[in-house]
Structures are given as C-alpha cells and as structure tokens.
Amino acid sequence: KNIRFTITTNGILLDDEKIEYINENMHNVVLSLDGRKEVNDNMRPTLNDKGSHDIILPKFKKLIETRPKDKYYYIRGTFTRENLDFSEDVMHFANEGFALTSVEPVVGDESNPYALREEDMPKVFEEYENLAVKYADMLKEGKDFKFFHFMIDINGGPCVAKRLSGCGS
C-alpha cells in the first residue's frame, strides 16, 4: 500500500527544519491563513496581541518555493461574518503567489459574533459571483491559480467516489 500523509499548519512554529521535514515526508500540506492581513490578524492575534499574518506569510512562501512539484499544498482561509468580501482574501492569496487556494465558511454557534447567519447567505452567494468574475479575469491575464470550490465536480461532489467505494482500508 502507498500511504500518503497530510499535515495542516498555522505556520507560527515553522522553521527551516520543519519546512524540510514537511516537504520530504508530507504528500499534502494545508497552510492555514485566514485571509488578508487585517482579516487574519483580527482572528489570530499572537500572545502579545499583535497580528500573526506577517510572521506566517514568509514561512508559507518559503515552504511552497521549496516544495517538490509532485507534492501538493493548499493555502486555506476562512470566511466569517466579518469578511463576507472573501473574494478579496482569495485574490490576496493568488497575488502572493499561492497557486492552490481554498477559503471555507466558518463553523460556529450563532452566538459568536463572527458566525455566519442565514441573513448573510445572499451576500455569500453574491461574493462567489464576484470571485468567479475576478477568477476569470486573472485567467485571461495568464495568472493561473486554482480555487478549490471551482474545481469540485458539481454533479458528483467531492466525496462521491469515496462514498460509493468505501475508504479502501
């Protein structure tokens, strides 16, 4: 059997040694950065209440620049009620050189101020349309990047093969 490992990191403790280990041993790596600087720093302050974006971003760039081409990564952001303009976060990732991107909705109790609510859904749908236009414009300019939600098979969904065949163990 061929076993492949995935790791998710917020990047804070990444150093050259860990980057080398990840690039040698992990088939897939998920780089967790909530979005552009103000979005990430609002959700992920450091212990001294300073933002973490500027600490993490150079480490993530180094990881992907040194990553073997036969191994994968995604930079993964999160959109919340506080950044319903999440297409800006996707564009931030693309403009920073990340070719494989994903931005997922936050999951949380509605009592959290950042939680998505039913009344936010029209804005979320509108923002996906905005993102589609921006994505198409970048592709026309020759700037190729992938956005996970636009890569999903709309007829089968991302997990249909696994549901039909089992986990394979």
Predicted segments with their positions:
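Radical SAM enzyme [4Fe-4S]-AdoMet core and its adjacent flexible, acidic
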Residues: 38, 42-61, 65, 69-162, ...
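Conserved SAM/AdoMet-binding glycine-rich loop
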Residues: 1-37
